[in-house]
């Protein structure tokens, strides 16, 4: 055979290239078992391999090698490999390497420079290799720490590495990289000890624990230096995609109690990971030195560029519990840290005993906690600084579902001089001054629920301490029960801005406590903007101040600590929030709710300060520059402060109040310095109100007085313009030839008239307070200029001003008992000039005077224009005192200088004309001049009677007589229909009735309507003499109303008797012609005459409800009785027309009488109605046309007629009030003439059974009446 050279070369190359892939295979069986002493051999023979292609040990049975104390050759491991990769294949058997007392690197296994792997074991146990106490032990497994020297545990059922010791790194495994994967039952690394790094595992590069479905446990491992459970030095290490429970418990090291990594470390996609009771033992850390840090995990990066640091993401449950460090990071220490997309995260009872970050510490780079879909809990963690979290870079908590920080503590000594020690009970976010401008600081954003409760700091920031802090776009934020011994019970920001914006749910600060700033302490710009609801409740600043130069004990809820030099650029702003509430906050010194040198509250929909307290000043707010403007309703209620029950303005400060989109109300506020007195605002020495304005339709209410320090002698008196007119802004004309783009566009703004109202009232004061003049007196030591709108003094209020000037487009309203006067202290020239004075009629009683007085030494009093009377409650002319003539002194005018100028004053008000309703009369005003030029105006009243208001007139009461008339008339009409064409046999019948009646309004009386319906039952019989008799009973239910304020529900019970007979009478030829003789035939010579009569009685019961003017109701009920008699006759004439079989002229006489009993209304101020009655006599006449048909047996009738009321006794009643005032109430009477039409029909259904129906309409010039009835009749 011949071979070519090319083939030979190719085959040779193939053989040599496959040679490294052909690993040597060695079986291990029970014959390889070893136990010292059992075989009589003192030494174990080392299993050495050096095949460059690698070695694979395959178990054919369970193998156990135990109690190895000596080995041959010496200085070897049980398994030593110096060649290619070394593999152990369990083939579903177990391998035990136990109590290996050897001191070679890797007592059980030593592999040089190549990979080591374990796979397919039912159980792999490496125990005590070497055992604890073995001198010079160097771990159980050692793989040379060079690239390629990996140790892999994969696809095993159980792996146990325990009680191994080493004087070097990694007591259980030391390798370049380590991979523990796909364990199906359990992996246990327990009680391994290294005097260097990695109590259980140590990798020069990375460690990977991934894809294990069984449990993985690192417990009670110890490293003298780094990583009690694992130490990984370089490259990315991962704990990834484990579906079994992964537990790190009770591991100990100087640094990184459970796991220490000097490169990126990722814990991702695991089902449940638990770090419990791990700890570090190193000394306190220095900057950029992690020694002693990370009770559970330490991830330290020498350089953070392009590094992710520690990443914990997409885990279902991650828990750090009871981990401890002696330095920083009770659970975690990381240069950079990200917690992303986890379901449940728990940090509980972790401790940094002498350092920062009880749960987490990040050194210089960013910290991020984001996208958690379950609950993230930081609870009862402890550190000297940052009880739960400490960060020196940006700290971002964003997009989480539920964040809970509770019971965490910063325990640093309260007198420590160290920076931030004892601060941040839950979170401390600190920025070095060099990085402040480029970093965000603490950023809590777009979370659904964030709760920080029960956290404690021994210095500042009970929950949060931050250099810079922003809370943005969260749904619900809760700060509850946090405590700081020094400042900021909930939050303390150090130097930079604080913002809380865009919260879509409720933000609550409640029951937080600190010596200063019960809830929030800031030093920079502080902004609360566009939040749905802000609630500050029950927060306390508890210190008792020992000096007056700092803010200790100030700011029950918020203290914005701005220096005097920063007021121009920094402030506390609360703007555009839907709801803002400060409730029951307390400060030992100033600012029960807010303490801020500069504060702006604007654009919010609803604001409430209630029940806040400050022992020194400013029950709700203490400020130097305060502006409250453009909000919805604003209320200050039940606040108290030593000075300034609601608001205190510091010396030389300014206050601006504008009610633009809602009212501002001060009520129930008190000043508690000395004796408790009503007080809304106190202005310190030199302080002033710069703006007091209300937009049209809105009011500022001062139910508690304002107080103000007296001006210094010779000092400048500032002007206060009330409701100033803001002029329209008109853009300037553009230059003719200039380019349009170069001209700035100035927006057009309309003039703002500010025509709202400022009210000073004592109406809500307790009677014991209102009886003391000082409690009802507002003092404004300013020159008041009322430019527009209204100033109202009511219910005993006094307004003291330096001077008062009124512009013509404004009005001063005053009640009896109120006072407008100038002050007396350091006031020499204060004057009062009124141009439009209006006096409240309701308050005039002849006892209390309206006082206008100038008390300055040289000022004058001038009143001009027309005096006006206003009637606030609209009830003055209902006062029974106006029944008689009166003389009422009501206006007292005086001036110390004696100058009272009334030259241009018209004291006969145009508004004093006789009213439309109430007591009638006329006024005359008489001025009386007394000593010193004092002028008293006396109002003289000449009484002329009483005119009730429409709601008191009650025309529906007499009109109910017409309702009874309509009802009884309709009953008789129904009986007439039922008796028409009645058979001669006895029978019974039943029918239904419906009525609708409307009467138009007349000049004095309201219109009314009636709707009633009911039923009627009757029977009839005919005597042999052809006399027909009938009897009937009926019941009706009615509703009527008067289109003003009253309505009546009625029930009617009625009985009727009816008789009918017919005769034939001869007619003379002159009587046979009639008005329609040209259309209808004349009457025959002998004509039948049909006579009928009816007598009816009805009892009517009425229940009336009246809506009275004071939003109450009056109830009445009474009875009335109806009597009706009707007699009449008709002359039926037969015809032979196809569609008209007969016609009948007729005439009737109807008499109706209704009598009504007197009654009294049930109401706060009841009316009494006397008895009344109605009598109406009418004569109806007309023609009835009839068409009869045999098939089917039926008859149709049409009646047209005219009626005149020949006699009427018009209904009316005497109406009285309990005070004796009375008037006559007349019914809205019907006109006397009526036209009516009725269509009716009868149809025979069966033998003895027929039905009937009719509909009619009666028209009068002022009323319409409609009736419909139907029924059926059975004849025996």
Curated annotation (Swiss-Prot):
Domain Autotransporter residue range list: 981-1276
Coiled coil (residue ranges): none
The organism's taxonomic lineage, starting at the top: Bacteria, Pseudomonadati, Chlamydiota, Chlamydiia, Chlamydiales
Protein name per the record: Probable outer membrane protein pmp6
Topology relative to the membrane: Peripheral membrane protein
Similarity field: Belongs to the PMP outer membrane protein family.
SUPFAM superfamilies: Autotransporter (SSF103515)
Taxonomic source organism: Chlamydia pneumoniae
GO cellular component: a single term: extracellular region
NCBIfam families: POMP_repeat (TIGR01376)
Gene name of the encoded protein: pmp6
